[in-house]
Amino acid sequence: MSNPENAQDAMLGNEPAVEPVVEPTAEQHTDTLPSIEEQFRALELKAAEHYDAWLRAKAEGENIRRRAQDDISKAHKFAVEKFAGELLAVKDSLEAALAVQEQTVDSFKSGVELTLKQLVSAFDKNALNEVNPAGEKFDPHKHQAIGMVDSEQEANTVVTVLQKGYMIADRVLRPALVMVAKGK
């Protein structure tokens, strides 16, 4: 059954106002919404923009990689430049010593000593350190044992250094060639 209030409204002719539902026409739809073709074109443009941006980013990445490789190559090529500059003074001293016509043993010896000081100075400036382990405990990372000898020293102690070793910073350039004490 119906509601009594609705019945009264119906008798009095007071019907509730109902708005008619109006369906939009096809023309109204096309005015407010873009067509599929327009949407497709817009998406194609956006895709082209993204593709272009991707290509640019890829090219920039390649350029950065190439520049980094060039920098590394130059660093390798010119890494010894400072050290080589230091060695030029040593070479000049040796050439000057050889150019002297009348040399005595003492003058020759003092010239060689000065040249050795220049070389040691160049080594020091470039973190090239001498390893002279006489009397130290044998370290296989810095020393190369040539043989073992009887000695009064403790076992595995360096007794004789046959050839000094060298290190650049903390890396062994050449291990010291040593003779090591045998166990007692």
UniProtKB/Swiss-Prot annotation:
**Is the Chaperone keyword given for this protein?**
yes
**MF GO annotations:** adenyl-nucleotide exchange factor activity; protein homodimerization activity; protein-folding chaperone binding; unfolded protein binding
- Superkingdom of source: Bacteria
GO CC field:
cytosol
Q: What are the subcellular locations of this protein?
A: Cytoplasm
Cysteine pairs forming cystine bridges in this chain are none
Q: Keyword set for this entry?
A: Chaperone, Cytoplasm, Stress response
List the GO biological process terms.
protein folding
- InterPro entries xrefs: GrpE, GrpE_coiled_coil, GrpE_head
Family annotation (Pfam families): GrpE
UniProt similarity note: Belongs to the GrpE family.
Q: What is the protein's known function?
A: Participates actively in the response to hyperosmotic and heat shock by preventing the aggregation of stress-denatured proteins, in association with DnaK and GrpE. It is the nucleotide exchange factor for DnaK and may function as a thermosensor. Unfolded proteins bind initially to DnaJ; upon interaction with the DnaJ-bound protein, DnaK hydrolyzes its bound ATP, resulting in the formation of a stable complex. GrpE releases ADP from DnaK; ATP binding to DnaK triggers the release of the substrate protein, thus completing the reaction cycle.
Which proteins does it associate with, and in what oligomeric form? Homodimer.
Please identify the protein, giving its name as recorded.
Answer: Protein GrpE
Origin species: Dechloromonas aromatica (strain RCB)
Upper classification of the organism:
Bacteria, Pseudomonadati, Pseudomonadota, Betaproteobacteria, Rhodocyclales
